[in-house]
C-alpha cells in the first residue's frame, strides 16, 4: 500500500514532462548515457502526504525495481550498458525528484519484484505491471499507462484474425511466464478446448 501511495501522491503533484521523440533503434531516440534526463522540482505538498513513520528502502533514495529490461520504450540500457533509460525510468525519476530523493533504479527479474516490494527491498516496482485482482490484494497501484494487449503472427501465417477468446483455443502462443497475459491465455484456452 505504501508504494502506490508514494507513486500516486508524487505523480498527482508533479507536472508531466515527457520526451518528445519516441522512435526506437536509431530512428530518433538517443540512448546515450550522458544525455540530460527529465527532472522536476521537489514538491512539498507531495512530501507532506507521506506517513510520518514511512521509511524508504534506502534512506534518502527512492528505490525502484524494473524488470522489463531492454523493452523500449519502457526500459532499455543506454550505450554504456549500465544506465537505464525509458519511460518507466522517467516516471520513477519524476517521483523521486518530487519527493526530494535520489533515484535508485534496480534491474531485477520479473519474479523478484513482488517479494522485493512486499519485503521493503524496493519502495516501488515500475515495470509494465498489469493491475489484477490478485495483485490488488497485496499492492496498491497508481496506473500511468493503458494496458492494451494484442497478438502478432508471421505475415505468412494461416491465422488472419483473432477476435474472441475461442479463437486462440489450441494454438501455440509464446508469452512471458508468470505474466497476466499468460493467465488470460491459459484461462481462455481451458474455457474453449
PLM feature spans:
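Bacterial N-terminal signal peptides
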Residues: 6-14
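Sec/Tat signal peptide C-region and signal peptidase I cleavage site
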Residues: 15-19
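Extracytoplasmic small-molecule ligand-binding "clamshell" domains
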Residues: 32-128
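Residues embedded in well-ordered beta-strands
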Residues: 63, 150-152
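Ligand-binding "clamshell"
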Residues: 79, 133-147, 190-193
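A ligand-binding cleft/hinge motif common to bilobed small-molecule-binding domains
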Residues: 111-115, 129-136, 184-188
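Flexible hinge/capping segments at coil-to-helix
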Residues: 154-173
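Secondary-structure junction motif
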Residues: 174-192
Amino acid at each position: 500500500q505504501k508504494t502506490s501511495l508514494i507513486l500516486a501522491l508524487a505523480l498527482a503533484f508533479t507536472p508531466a514532462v515527457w520526451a518528445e521523440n519516441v522512435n526506437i533503434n536509431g530512428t530518433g531516440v538517443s540512448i546515450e548515457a550522458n544525455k540530460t534526463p527529465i527532472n522536476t522540482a521537489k514538491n512539498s505538498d507531495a512530501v507532506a502526504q507521506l506517513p510520518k513513520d514511512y521509511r524508504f528502502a534506502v534512506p534518502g533514495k527512492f528505490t525502484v525495481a524494473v524488470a522489463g529490461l531492454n523493452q523500449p520504450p519502457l526500459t532499455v540500457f543506454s550505450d554504456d550498458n549500465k544506465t537505464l533509460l525509458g519511460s518507466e525510468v522517467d516516471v520513477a525519476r519524476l517521483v523521486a525528484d518530487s519527493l526530494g530523493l535520489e533515484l535508485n533504479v534496480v534491474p531485477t527479474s520479473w519474479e523478484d519484484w513482488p517479494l522485493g516490494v512486499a519485503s521493503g527491498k524496493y519502495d516501488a516496482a515500475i515495470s509494465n505491471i498489469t493491475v489484477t485482482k490478485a495483485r490488488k490484494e497485496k499492492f496498491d497501484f497508481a496506473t500511468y499507462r493503458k494496458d492494451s494487449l494484442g497478438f502478432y503472427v508471421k505475415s505468412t501465417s494461416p491465422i488472419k484474425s483473432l477476435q474472441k477468446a475461442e479463437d486462440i483455443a489450441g494454438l501455440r502462443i509464446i508469452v512471458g511466464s508468470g505474466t497476466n497475459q499468460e493467465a488470460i491465455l491459459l484461462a481462455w484456452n481451458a474455457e474453449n478446448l
